[in-house]
Amino acid sequence: MVRRDRLRRMREWWVQVGLLAVPLLAAYLHIPPPQLSPALHSWKTSGKFFTYKGLRIFYQDSVGVVGSPEIVVLLHGFPTSSYDWYKIWEGLTLRFHRVIALDFLGFGFSDKPRPHQYSIFEQASIVESLLRHLGLQNRRINLLSHDYGDIVAQELLYRYKQNRSGRLTIKSLCLSNGGIFPETHRPLLLQKLLKDGGVLSPILTRLMNFFVFSRGLTPVFGPYTRPTESELWDMWAGIRNNDGNLVIDSLLQYINQRKKFRRRWVGALASVTIPIHFIYGPLDPINPYPEFLELYRKTLPRSTVSILDDHISHYPQLEDPMGFLNAYMGFINSF
């Protein structure tokens, strides 16, 4: 009898917990995205949108040096956006006539359709479509990329090498801290869980919040160059815009694509004759030193490399904008 009463009370207790948990969970899952900071709001309002196959793609296009024919297109990393380039933007306008950046599909202020099979091939096609939209499809383009953007740049380079219809005419390529080699890439634990999580992935993406995001991203910055809380909120606001946290698992399929198409993408880097450079933050836990750099130099002996200070990590353009900009300008002025 006593045991039966105890079981009944336990059942009642769990029912009460459930009744409390359901509305709390519902409220949590419907937390609105954070408001944009004045700086991020300014970035959005100064940009524009174009349409790719019915989807809105955000981009920035600044006119810089008058009379210069030079154009640079910036390709951002995962999981952030074109806002990653804001610290070097003005410096680039002092050297280039056009400075252009976009938010890839599923990132930043661009549309984030779901369900959707996100792919590096589609992102490369979006870059080509943007340049056609701007009337620059026949101009020689300098590509500057980071992380995820490095893989998109590799596909653009492959199309250029194959002389594909609609391809960009690439003048130069500068990569930075991207996992261009699957064998030296060390994804974060959360990335591993999300890309292979199956039925678990949709649950994890819905439970992701600022605390989880910031604790996951901060370690990929150097110890002296970590973002402030307000900077992390800007990154998180870009992700939460258009419910972007719900497509992170789909976007992460690029890791599997990179393994599948390694020969195509690494081969494109190794076989072209345009100037190629790599800017490297050596403390990067995702592309660790010296394994990554040794393989890079072995695979691409013609490429030049700039190694930043020892404490610079995975986001060199944010951690050391002046060092990054100087390294890039040194490369651009070398040919």
Curated annotation (Swiss-Prot):
It comes from the Eukaryota. The keyword Nucleotidyltransferase does not apply. The keyword Glycoprotein applies. One of its GO terms (biological process) is regulation of lipid storage. Glycans are attached at N163. It is found in: Endoplasmic reticulum membrane. Its EC number is 3.-.-.-. This is Mesoderm-specific transcript homolog protein. Residues 71-310 form the AB hydrolase-1 domain. PANTHER family: HYDROLASE, PUTATIVE (AFU_ORTHOLOGUE AFUA_2G14860)-RELATED, MONOACYLGLYCEROL LIPASE. Its main location: endoplasmic reticulum. It is a multi-pass membrane protein. Keywords: Endoplasmic reticulum, Glycoprotein, Hydrolase, Membrane, Transmembrane, Transmembrane helix. A motif (RVIALD) lies at residues 98-103. One of its GO terms (cellular component) is endoplasmic reticulum membrane. GO terms for molecular function: hydrolase activity. Belongs to the AB hydrolase superfamily. The chain crosses the membrane at residues 13-33, 63-83, 266-286. It comes from Rattus norvegicus (Rat). The gene is Mest.
